[in-house]
């Protein structure tokens, strides 16, 4: 199908594209030996820099025809047609006005060479610029240095009025756009005037005009101190009024100017209240300690009462009494309000059923640790023994060999000893 399509296209035009076989070939690439249309040529030769360097030839759109000129001599040799141009040109099926001769339109059969100013040279130039080391041109550098204005530090000097005016004009012309304009300065001055509440036309800007003199500062500090004193007095009056309120909620009106004496009396009252409250707390604690009484038994009377009734314990044997760190017994009797109750003191927060008294848990823990220690030790011994046995076993090419087969292989006559 591709061949028939190529033949069909070739019948209408000079040559079909070797890549897409759909359009007329516009370029011939000698490196690829292919006729390509415009789109295929741009696609193929823009893939990489190597493909961009391929030399290509632009094909003609019209079929060449040999034109005879009247002024040509018979001795002049005829034009030679390129070798690659043979074999694919076709004559037109219909006459194209061969009777008319147009001397202005002359078709050259020779394909012109690609000029140096082709588009491929642009790519080469770009690659050279990318990989090229910059060269310092002294002429260009001098011109650049002359164009640049070097900043200079100038010391103030006494100048005349004409020089000052000229410099101001030059500065305005050179630094135009860097400094604020006159309109901006006027707006800024108006804003400052509104902030200060007065004009800036006066010549002196002293501290007195701005309201920051020493006398006024002293007055401000004095006013602040007086306000603080009044607030303290008001607070003290409120405190005394709250303390002197009656049960009905009425507040008696009393005018007192003795601030220090009243302050001292209030402090004394507060200290008295604190001392009285502390004494009450101590008394309550003492009463609580007095209420908690330990039971004191008369051992002689108890022994005489239980003389012939046997042991007082239900099990028949006295229980084991363990003392904790604080020295209190594990079982104690406390009397509260005339009634005696039994309380069980659990030592260290452990229950009696945990076996702490007889060392049950400690014994179990010690047995577990001993068992674990011996198990690890026996495990190490077992692995060491296996390692030694493996090292002593005979090997052949890294593998274990049975001793019988080794002895048979060692004997020259195959006799096992």
Curated annotation (Swiss-Prot):
Domain of life: Eukaryota
Coiled-coil portions: 212-239
Compartments, record wording: Nucleus
Main location as per UniProt: nucleus
Residues engaged in binding Zn(2+): 17, 20, 40, 45
Residues in B box-type zinc fingers: 17-59
Family according to the record: Belongs to the CONSTANS family.
Protein name, as recorded: Zinc finger protein CONSTANS-LIKE 16
Gene source species: Arabidopsis thaliana
